[in-house]
Each structure stands twice: as structure tokens, then as C-alpha cells.
Amino acid sequence: MAGISEVPVATADRLRGEGHRILDVREDDEFAAGHIAGAVHVPLMQIPARAAELDRDADWLAVCRVGGRSLQATAYLSRLGLRVANVEGGMEAWSGAGLPFEGAAGGPGRVI
């Protein structure tokens, strides 16, 4: 989508270390199977109803499984004035790059 900020996973990991927040827009079962530690979980279909819960002063990185749903969330939230970038390739790329993520109760995660 034109005008939407996207970042590769290595950049997203660096930005996360610098204080950017992670917004995971996958479904509950996907999030439970594996997610980036500290991620805020709001499934894509709940974004319109729950956007007000997101810190408007934060810089956000949106993620899903491969990047499509998070791109939609990024476009919507950007129109609302939030500072948000899409993580290219989503959790598949994150996992493929060997970046850390966890499953339920802090155990090993997997991408479904």
C-alpha cells in the first residue's frame, strides 16, 4: 500500500529494543502458539473497536503471520494518527531470522 511504512524484521527487532511497541493482530490461537515477548494482542477484526486502547504516544510495529493483516492494521491505525509501521514478512520472517519469540507461559513458541 502506498504511503505505508514497512520495516524488515532485523530493523523491527532493533526498533523494539529502542522502545517501539509490538502490536500483534493475529487470532487468539496464533498468538498463544508464539508471539514476540511484550507484544500487545489485538486481533485485526477488533482493531476498530479497540484502537483507543493503544498508546497514541508510542511508536508501534504491527505484525501478523506473513504481513497482510498487519498491513491492513497499519493502514487503518495510520489514518487515525498513530505512528505505526508494518513488519515485512510477519512472524514467519521473524522466526526464519532466528529472532526471539515465546509461546504460552513463556515456553518455546511456534508460528501457526
Where are these regions (language model features)?
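Short, surface-exposed ligand- or partner-binding patches at beta-edge/loop junctions that are enriched
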Residues: V63
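Rhodanese-like catalytic fold shared by cysteine-dependent sulfurtransferases
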Residues: M1-R21, E27-W60, G68-I112
